[in-house]
Amino acid sequence: METPSKAPESSLMSCNEPSSCTSEQDVKSQELAKQGERLLSQLYQPLEACNNPCYCKKCCYHCQLCFLKKGLGICYERKGRRRRTPKKAKAHSSSASDKSISTRTGNSQTEKKQTKTPETALETARGLGQ
């Protein structure tokens, strides 16, 4: 009867050995997961400003920001855009929009026509004479 009692003990030992292996694997996988998280956190951190004004090859490849900005010419800074006029200013300009377009621009167009007519008359006279 001693042999059957030894068999379960050996089966328990064989079960314990793989569990220790799996626990080691779990620890390794957790460490790898932590390393992966650290790498991702470093990847998503904003790039630090590099104030080196030089555009030589060495300085262009100095860091990732320099490469993007100087080497590739990519700049992610916000460009200055037109600001919309405030609503109060629009209310004042609406009184000017009540007038028709012809009355607003009519005077300026007639002045331009008057100044151009003598010049065009001289040019046509010269063109005919030659």
Curated annotation (Swiss-Prot):
Chain positions with Phosphoserine modification: 94
PTM info: The phosphorylation by CDK9 does not seem to be important for transactivation function.
Region listing for Cysteine-rich, in residue ranges: 50-66
Sites bearing Phosphothreonine, chain numbering: 85
Keywords, sorted A to Z: Activator, AIDS, Host nucleus, Host-virus interaction, Phosphoprotein, RNA-binding, Transcription, Transcription regulation
Molecular function, one GO term: RNA-binding transcription regulator activity
S-S bonds: none
Cross-referenced InterPro entries: IV_Tat, Tat_dom_sf
Keyword Phosphoprotein part of the UniProt annotation: yes
Leader sequence residues: none
Low complexity composition bias: residue spans: 92-102
GO biological process assignments: positive regulation of viral transcription
Role noted for this protein: Transcriptional activator that increases RNA Pol II processivity, thereby increasing the level of full-length viral transcripts. Recognizes a hairpin structure at the 5'-LTR of the nascent viral mRNAs referred to as the transactivation responsive RNA element (TAR) and recruits the cyclin T1-CDK9 complex (P-TEFb complex) that will in turn hyperphosphorylate the RNA polymerase II to allow efficient elongation. The CDK9 component of P-TEFb and other Tat-activated kinases hyperphosphorylate the C-terminus of RNA Pol II that becomes stabilized and much more processive.
Family designation: Belongs to the lentiviruses Tat family.
Protein's name according to its UniProt entry: Protein Tat
Gene from which this protein is expressed: tat
